[in-house]
From Swiss-Prot:
Taxonomic classification: Eukaryota, Metazoa, Chordata, Craniata, Vertebrata
Tissue and organ distribution: Highly expressed specifically in surface cells of the antrum mucosa from where it is secreted.
Cleaved signal peptide residues: 1-20
Family: Belongs to the gastrokine family.
Keyword Nucleotide-binding assigned: no
GO biological process annotation, one example: positive regulation of cell division
Gene it is expressed from: GKN1
Protein name: Gastrokine-1
Function (record text): Has mitogenic activity and may be involved in maintaining the integrity of the gastric mucosal epithelium.
UniProt organism field: Sus scrofa
Subcellular location: Secreted; Cytoplasmic granule; Golgi apparatus
InterPro entries: BRICHOS_dom (IPR007084), Gastrokine (IPR051772)
Lineage top rank: taxon: Eukaryota
Keyword Signal: yes
Amino acid sequence: MKFTIAFAGLLGVFLTPALADYSISVNDDGNSGGSGQQSVSVNNEHNVANVDNNNGWNSWNALWDYRTGFAVTRLFEKKSCIVHKMKKEAMPSLQALDALVKEKKLQGKGPGGPPPKSLRYSVNPNRVDNLDKFGKSIVAMCKGIPTYMAEEIQGANLISYSEKCISANILWILNISFCGGIAEN
């Protein structure tokens, strides 16, 4: 009996950090044209990362659901959500993001590594009828909010694309632009 209690205690000590949520906050005042604050939370248990950008009316939240392969950005100014498929080649893995958070490499002036990757999406003007196909986390974030699907714009289409875009620059990792659709309003 004593062995079982000791084993359970040790298991809890070692397992808790592996399943814990980690958060950091980053002040964005030093960037050109940027202000406000971003924070990132990693939830290993649910395979989800959440980025909050607090900048007054231009605030937004991004949620990356690694289990379903979808991401969503909730734009407070537009009172809407934009869902898109995660591009695994451009977005850091949950483990890599978790490591950056734990090591606090995202604080200060950035990790000092390569420039952030950029993704550009075209927003479909038609609302998404059923959020369930995107997973519980996205449903919880966007239920009751107009939600739109976005498709990545690739290659030569990027050069000739002239529609208005909304940017969501995520720390010093990824620059995402949502173009057309609700960005035009």
